[in-house]
């Protein structure tokens, strides 16, 4: 798929088919997350790839955004391992995690899969479910799977600011 097609096709899917994602596709998606850039290549990020039914069921309790995805990629970051901007002390961990999560979503779209970025969840409850998550701050839960037949972009999906509203060009 052409890169611009990937960008234009991706939407927030809120209805997933009851179909398992092939392991080869999962591996390619995770590789995209692994090679995503991070500030000073510190890589203060971790991905939990959740597909086992018991853990997926437990995760339902941490958010109201449950749409039947067979795979959830939880992205977390460790601020203590991240680059910090010296001018104002801004920690780059969350930005790094957001970059990784975006790579994961675009890679999934490239594989013919749908995604939903979920940011509304209880991180303390999630911490109790995911192994080896102490010290991590959770940034996103990316729902991944084949879209259900009835799935379609929301009515506001195509609403975008104009280039003039979004961009200032300095020549």
Predicted regions located by residue number:
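Structured binding elements
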Residues: 112
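C-terminal helix-cap and adjacent tail motif
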Residues: 3-20, 25, 140-171
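Alpha-helix/helix-capping structural signal
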Residues: 54, 121-124
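Glycine/small-residue-rich phosphate/adenosyl-binding loop
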Residues: 25-31, 35-100
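Short, electropositive alpha-helical surface patch
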Residues: 125-139
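Short beta-strand segments at enzyme active-site cores
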Residues: 115-119
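Short hydrophobic alpha-helices that are characteristic scaffold elements of the AMP-binding
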Residues: 106-109
